[in-house]
Amino acid sequence: LFGSVFTGLAAGIAFGPRVFSQFSRRRLFGAALAVSGFFLVALALISNLVIAVIVTIILGAFSGISWVTGFTMLGMEVENEVRGRTFAFVQSLIRIVLVAVLAIAPLIAAAVGEHTYKFYNSEVTYNGAAITILIAGILAALIGIVSYRQMRDRPGISLVSDIVSALR
């Protein structure tokens, strides 16, 4: 799964801006972030490795689109005098959040433990790591939806029609 997320990330960074070149960057950032969150939720619920690899590649692609779009918007919005400091601050903040997540996520996973759910004749077992990923996916999807709504620069145009026109 580690290799597939980075394969998807590279594909999203390389091809996302080309595929969605006519799409609004502001809308693309929020939408891609929300879709990444939804695929992270799906990944947390899937126990089949082949399907998980496919979902992970798609997750990585939308994460790459979010990453490159976010950094592009940041570079366009920030003035030249403070751009270097702004990017340094963002990179430092990313590292701090990464260390915090690496410290806190195992604690959450251990606290949640393992749960078994029974549906009719089948049984599904989820461990704390899967539920922690599920929580992270829900948070990412909610943050993506909120950012999409806040940065919506064309309120009269629906997301679906904007995607269709961007892909033509």
What are these language model-derived features?
Residues 1-167:
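C-terminal transmembrane bundle of multi-pass solute transporters/carriers
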